[in-house]
Amino acid sequence: MAEQTEKAFLKQPKVFLSSKISGKGKRPGKGGNRFWKNIGLGFKTPREAIDGAYIDSKCPFTGTVSIRGRILAGTCHSAKMQRTIIVRRNYLHFVKKYQRYEKRHSNIPAHVSPCFRVKEGDHVIIGQCRPLSKTVRFNVLKVIPAGASAFGKKAFTGV
């Protein structure tokens, strides 16, 4: 089980902890003392979500959040918050008067499950879900490390 650091007892709502039989299930959410699911949309469930011991009700793989709506990609701009990052999306806006493009960006806060290790500069794919807080409406689905992608910590990488 996860380390109990909160005042309330942390547990997954769909797992019965007092079971006399403990076996690892091979199908999503079946057997064992850990609930996990396949979110679909072509995204694989991370090994850390299946084998890990963390408890996160807002995790799309082990929690009660479903991914629906938009799937976006961007670069992690800030990872200073707990379990939340800022994803920067760069784009070009056409100015009709001058027949030119100008650089613009948008910042999107997204929840990060503890099964991911995200650093600034990493390329992430996020999916829309129900509102998780006042500003957070997206969840991280996949992380591509900064060294593995062509993107970096640069402010604007172009389109």
From Swiss-Prot:
GO terms for cellular component: plastid; ribonucleoprotein complex; ribosome. It holds the Pfam family Ribosomal_S17. It is found in: Cytoplasm. It comes from the Eukaryota. Its main location: cytoplasm. GO terms for molecular function: mRNA binding; rRNA binding; structural constituent of ribosome. Keywords: Cytoplasm, Ribonucleoprotein, Ribosomal protein, RNA-binding, rRNA-binding. One of its GO terms (biological process) is translation. InterPro entries: NA-bd_OB-fold, Ribosomal_uS17, Ribosomal_uS17_arc/euk, Ribosomal_uS17_CS, Ribosomal_uS17_N. Belongs to the universal ribosomal protein uS17 family. PANTHER family: 40S RIBOSOMAL PROTEIN S11 FAMILY MEMBER, SMALL RIBOSOMAL SUBUNIT PROTEIN US17X-RELATED. NCBIfam families: PRK08572.1, uS17_arch. This is Small ribosomal subunit protein uS17x. It comes from Arabidopsis thaliana.
